[in-house]
Amino acid sequence: MDLGKVITAMVTPIHPEKDKVCKKRIHHLVNHLIENGSDGLVIAGTTGESPTLSHDEKIKLFRQVIETNDGRAKLIAGTGSNNTAETIAFTKEVAELGGIDAVLIVAPYYNKPNQDGLYAHFAAVAEASDLPVVIYNIPGRSVVNIEPETIIRLAALPNIVGVKESSGNLDNISKIIAETSDDFQVYSGDDSLTLPILAVGGNGVISVASHVVGNEMQEMIQAFERGEVQKAAQIHRELLPLMNGLFSVPNPAPTKYLLNQQGISVGPVRLPLVDLNAEQGTKLQAILEGLSK
């Protein structure tokens, strides 16, 4: 299964007055992303503020994205949690919606399982799931790192098709790529590491920056794949200040700020996250405007 090169970890549009997942804004955002470089979308992931979405809100979100997408982009639903049984049940429920291509399963957070526990968790979900599974390794948030040896073992299971690697450890990522099959897809979970991970054999990126520079992210990857490494490196350097700026305060507040400024209304972030203040917003806007100079 080819999930694409640029997969956007989509923000969740929230109505600013009603504090509800907003159907109209979802429709607008999905079309914007697909028309501007996104091969696929991750729905209800970290950038989608999944911890503050209820079960019913996630289902509503999935349904609306499926309807708007109409088969154009690959859809990956975030169905993971730190409860294996709950993850399995929710993944099965999402599979019944139709229109979802794969699920993203985050490393269990807070519980701090060891490597045997991590393997057993992902193996149980993969065995029970009708949808292909993408592992999500993000030790900065989940506290535990899925070691490359564990990911390599999991990659041998028939229903585990890839990993979103947000560890930032290129040595580990290189080992995963070297010791898994060619059809196991390794995605950068950090925009700034997209090009380095491509250079060691990765497939693409699950991106935040692609909300606002999706075409440029595509151009960078395509240039690299054509062998135009210097051009790809130049694009990387040009985009790097924005990639870093989007994490100047906790994600996805900066991304939502820029989208709202561009007329793509996605509303605020939910507490305990807070929106950018005026000074933060001005600095971020200046970074974006600097890209075109």
UniProtKB/Swiss-Prot annotation:
Localization, UniProt: Cytoplasm
Residues flagged as site, Part of a proton relay during catalysis: 46, 110
EC number of the protein: 4.3.3.7
UniProt catalytic activity: L-aspartate 4-semialdehyde + pyruvate = (2S,4S)-4-hydroxy-2,3,4,5-tetrahydrodipicolinate + H2O + H(+)
GO molecular function, one term: 4-hydroxy-tetrahydrodipicolinate synthase activity
Gene Ontology biological process terms from the UniProt entry: diaminopimelate biosynthetic process; lysine biosynthetic process via diaminopimelate
Lyase found in the keyword field: yes
Keywords, ordered alphabetically: Amino-acid biosynthesis, Cytoplasm, Diaminopimelate biosynthesis, Lyase, Lysine biosynthesis, Schiff base
An example Gene Ontology CC term for this record: cytosol
InterPro entries: Aldolase_TIM, DapA, DapA-like, Schiff_base-form_aldolases_AS, Schiff_base-form_aldolases_CS
PROSITE patterns from the UniProt entry: DHDPS_1, DHDPS_2
Active site, per annotation: 136 (proton donor/acceptor), 164 (schiff-base intermediate with substrate)
UniProt pathway: Amino-acid biosynthesis; L-lysine biosynthesis via DAP pathway; (S)-tetrahydrodipicolinate from L-aspartate: step 3/4
SMART domains listed in its UniProt record: DHDPS (SM01130)
Pfam family, one: DHDPS
Broadest EC class assigned to this enzyme: lyase
Positions that bind pyruvate: 47, 206
Function recorded in the entry: Catalyzes the condensation of (S)-aspartate-beta-semialdehyde [(S)-ASA] and pyruvate to 4-hydroxy-tetrahydrodipicolinate (HTPA).
Family assignment from sequence similarity: Belongs to the DapA family.
HAMAP family hit by this protein: DapA
Subunit field text: Homotetramer; dimer of dimers.
Protein's recorded name: 4-hydroxy-tetrahydrodipicolinate synthase
